[in-house]
């Protein structure tokens, strides 16, 4: 039944997006999850990661990275091309995690995810750095924008209100390109246009915790997830 509900919801979103105008449109919320009960936690499904533990604590979804793993990713039930996702994420302070690894940890939002590829907003709580990046199916990363000394990024145990949108441009010289906008605490901190948007065929929306290094024991919480689409009205 869960698979059927997800499929129906995805078809509904696809139908609504057929009438949407893309970048620059007003947005309407189609999914919200405050992670307050087992039913809401169960709506979040694993997307990728070799050894990842999930749970719930004090009204939040928890992620713990396991042995020989660099990143753990999860998705919402919403599938679509032109979406915006927002969430409040916290990097947990873990004394057992080496300081060099903890410093390299990032909190991320993912759009157009599938087959290992995705657009990603990666925020580094201990470096005050934000990146918009394009991850391809072979694991290579194209950095579309990198911003340092970003005000508003909280450190370990601090809430980070993140938001990422990816909308295809529907007219003009850049028609077919994806416009990506990234926000921290309601402030626009990074943006990019990707003329190679067609390279990503995935449609999943979600979030990740990761590091460039193996990060056994690292953890994060995720709360107040919202997904929006361009309004067709």
Region spans (language model):
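Carbohydrate-binding surfaces in secreted/extracellular proteins
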Residues: 35, 87, 155-193
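Flexible glycan-contacting loops in extracellular carbohydrate-active proteins
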Residues: 192-223
